[in-house]
Amino acid sequence: MYKALNYWVYGGFTGEKTPYEFIDFAAAQGLDGVEFTVGDCIKIDITEEECKKIAAYAAVKKIGLRTMATGFYWGCSLSTPDEAERSQAVEFTRKYIQIANWLGVETILVIPGDTRVPWDESRPVVSYKDVWEYSKRSIDEVTPLAEELNVNLALENVWNRFLFSPMEWKLYLDQFASEKVGIYFDLANCCIYCRPQDYIEILKERVLAIHVKNFSESDCAGGLHGFGDDLLEGMVDFDAVQKVLESINYKGALTAEMVPFSRLPDMVLPDEELARVTCQKLKTLFL
């Protein structure tokens, strides 16, 4: 299976490492690919020429660029009732799709919306019904471009107080006729609600990409500190996940995302040693 590393653990949230350095690092670790992040590693105003250079360099190093992520949507939502902000999020997504096409990326991570951002009180609280309707409308706006440029829109299950269960996700995704719209499934983000293998079993071919990470429960649920700094420690049953992935003939990316919130308030990224250890542990999974 294709195994990759998300940029943030290696390069941080402000783009401290270049795409070329990240490619070199992944190649040295024996990975199949990397996941660039737009807004830090990859600037939103990057040119087609620079994207082609990066893609060519990755090809020489035999490093895939199958997925791409962003943290943009936490501050600018596709589901906000604020029309100006929503338009800004839609326009960002169009640029994001174009960058993916230039780089040869097949799948981008999109956060469909949020009823509340629990760690940011400055963000508005929006009703579940409105998030459903506005996010659907926004995704419909960008889907034609995604189809034209052959880029998948993978909506991630995050702590956005929206779409908690596998069946909610199925109902939501079934609204979209396009095969370009699916889920970017995070194995750890769902653990306070349901087992990850249950989502995969129900969503099947709608699973377009996977974030590999872990979560440790506390007090019958858990908070941000449940996201530790050891990929192999936590609630995720990787053997069960692999079994269900094989049952649906999953061929997408398996990308380790390591943001060790358990270290708060002393979390520091980038952490190259943690990135290296995470790569080695990822390689022991999904054999």
Q: Could you tell me what each predicted segment is?
A:
Residues M1-V9, T67-L78, D114-S122:
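N-terminal small/glycine-rich loop or linker at the start of catalytic domains
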Residues E35-A55, P112-W119:
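Glycine-rich, proline-tolerant flexible connector loops at the mouths of alpha/beta enzymes
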Residues D40, W74-T80, R116-E121, I192-Y193, ...:
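A short acidic, helix-capping loop that chelates divalent metal ions and anchors anionic groups
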Residues V9-G11, V38-D40, G71-W74, D114-R116, ...:
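Active-site-proximal loop/turn and secondary-structure-junction residues that shape catalytic pockets
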Residues M1-D32, D140, P166-F185, N189-L287:
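Histidine-acidic metal/acid-base catalytic patches
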Residues K17-D24, Y57-V60, L78-G182:
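Active-site acidic/histidine proton-transfer and metal-coordination neighborhood
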Residues E35, T67, L109, A154, ...:
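Conserved beta-strand positions in the central sheet of alpha/beta enzyme cores
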